[in-house]
Protein backbone atom coordinates (compact mmCIF):
# COMPACT_ATOMS: atom_id res chain seq x y z
CA UNK A 1 0.00 0.00 0.00
CA UNK A 2 1.28 3.47 -0.91
CA UNK A 3 -0.51 6.04 1.21
CA UNK A 4 -0.72 9.77 0.62
CA UNK A 5 -2.40 12.64 2.44
CA UNK A 6 -4.45 15.06 0.35
CA UNK A 7 -5.60 18.36 1.81
CA UNK A 8 -8.09 20.71 0.17
CA UNK A 9 -8.73 24.22 1.49
CA UNK A 10 -10.64 27.14 0.03
CA UNK A 11 -13.88 29.01 -0.36
CA UNK A 12 -16.78 26.56 -0.22
CA UNK A 13 -18.55 25.86 -3.49
CA UNK A 14 -20.67 23.10 -4.98
CA UNK A 15 -18.82 20.05 -6.28
CA UNK A 16 -15.41 20.20 -4.60
CA UNK A 17 -15.60 16.67 -3.18
CA UNK A 18 -17.12 15.36 -6.41
CA UNK A 19 -14.36 16.82 -8.60
CA UNK A 20 -11.52 15.59 -6.39
CA UNK A 21 -13.01 12.11 -5.95
CA UNK A 22 -13.79 11.84 -9.66
CA UNK A 23 -10.16 12.59 -10.51
CA UNK A 24 -8.94 10.00 -8.00
CA UNK A 25 -11.36 7.36 -9.24
CA UNK A 26 -10.46 7.96 -12.88
CA UNK A 27 -6.82 7.29 -12.05
CA UNK A 28 -7.40 4.24 -9.83
CA UNK A 29 -6.55 5.94 -6.53
CA UNK A 30 -8.48 4.47 -3.60
CA UNK A 31 -9.87 6.76 -0.88
CA UNK A 32 -9.20 5.10 2.48
CA UNK A 33 -10.49 7.85 4.76
CA UNK A 34 -11.98 11.30 4.34
CA UNK A 35 -12.88 14.13 6.68
CA UNK A 36 -14.34 17.46 5.67
CA UNK A 37 -15.79 20.48 7.37
CA UNK A 38 -16.93 23.95 6.47
CA UNK A 39 -15.92 26.75 8.82
CA UNK A 40 -17.47 30.17 8.18
CA UNK A 41 -17.73 29.48 4.46
CA UNK A 42 -14.28 27.90 4.10
CA UNK A 43 -14.07 24.31 2.94
CA UNK A 44 -11.47 22.04 4.59
CA UNK A 45 -10.92 18.41 3.62
CA UNK A 46 -8.29 15.83 4.46
CA UNK A 47 -8.09 12.49 2.70
CA UNK A 48 -5.92 9.43 3.12
CA UNK A 49 -5.56 7.62 -0.18
CA UNK A 50 -3.79 4.56 -1.54
CA UNK A 51 -2.09 5.28 -4.86
CA UNK A 52 -0.40 1.86 -5.26
CA UNK A 53 -2.52 1.05 -8.33
CA UNK A 54 -2.62 4.55 -9.79
CA UNK A 55 -2.16 4.86 -13.53
CA UNK A 56 0.04 7.96 -13.08
CA UNK A 57 3.26 8.36 -11.18
CA UNK A 58 3.10 10.25 -7.89
CA UNK A 59 4.65 13.46 -9.25
CA UNK A 60 2.16 13.66 -12.11
CA UNK A 61 -0.72 13.06 -9.71
CA UNK A 62 0.49 15.87 -7.42
CA UNK A 63 0.70 18.28 -10.35
CA UNK A 64 -2.70 17.27 -11.70
CA UNK A 65 -4.32 17.77 -8.29
CA UNK A 66 -2.74 21.22 -7.94
CA UNK A 67 -4.08 22.12 -11.40
CA UNK A 68 -7.51 20.79 -10.47
CA UNK A 69 -7.45 22.97 -7.37
CA UNK A 70 -6.66 26.01 -9.51
CA UNK A 71 -9.59 25.12 -11.78
CA UNK A 72 -12.09 24.90 -8.92
CA UNK A 73 -10.70 27.71 -6.78
CA UNK A 74 -9.19 25.75 -3.90
CA UNK A 75 -5.70 24.76 -2.83
CA UNK A 76 -4.98 21.04 -3.12
CA UNK A 77 -1.80 19.56 -1.67
CA UNK A 78 -0.73 15.93 -1.79
CA UNK A 79 2.13 14.40 0.19
CA UNK A 80 3.34 10.89 0.74
CA UNK A 81 2.18 9.68 4.15
CA UNK A 82 5.70 9.21 5.52
CA UNK A 83 6.66 12.80 4.65
CA UNK A 84 3.44 14.19 6.12
CA UNK A 85 3.96 12.19 9.32
CA UNK A 86 7.56 13.33 9.75
CA UNK A 87 6.63 16.97 9.14
CA UNK A 88 3.87 16.91 11.76
CA UNK A 89 5.62 14.93 14.47
CA UNK A 90 5.75 16.75 17.80
From Swiss-Prot:
CDD domains found in the cross-reference section: ACT_1ZPV
Domain ACT: start-end pairs: 5-79
InterPro entries per the UniProt record, alphabetical: ACT-like_dom_sf, ACT_dom, UPF0237/GcvR_regulator, UPF0237_ACT
A Pfam family hit: ACT_6
Top-rank taxon, per record: Bacteria
Sequence similarity: Belongs to the UPF0237 family.
Protein name: UPF0237 protein BL1209.1
Source organism (scientific name): Bifidobacterium longum (strain NCC 2705)
Amino acid sequence: MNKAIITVVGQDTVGIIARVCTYLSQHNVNVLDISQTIIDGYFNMMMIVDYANADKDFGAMVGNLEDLGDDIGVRIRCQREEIFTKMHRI
